[in-house]
Amino acid sequence: MATDLTAHFDANADRIRGELFDFLRIPSVSARSEHDADTRRAAEWLRGAMQRAGLRAELLDTEGHPVVLGEWRQAGADKPTVLVYGHYDVQPAEPLELWDSPPFEPTVRDGRIYARGSVDD
């Protein structure tokens, strides 16, 4: 299976990287109300990505930012359930002077992607 995934990524690397960069360009800073629309746009982007991957996906509105729920139930009732839990928002990028490139413009340096939200701890 790992070989299949590697082959798939190799064959689609430019498209996959482009989609990731599109997502990383969204300043989904949930801690700042001026980015509420951006945060919703990130949720909508994620829902669309799930749908393109064949999942049933929806946004669930909350008192805060929407939850993105996606599911794929074709494996069969006798198969285990897998839950992936994460977040699509980011923290503020300040202080900006510590960035070598704009935080919401993905940049590749030394084979690594630099952008706000490209990794998490």
Segments from the language model and where they lie:
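Acidic/His- and Gly-rich active-site-bordering loop/insert found
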Residues: 2-120
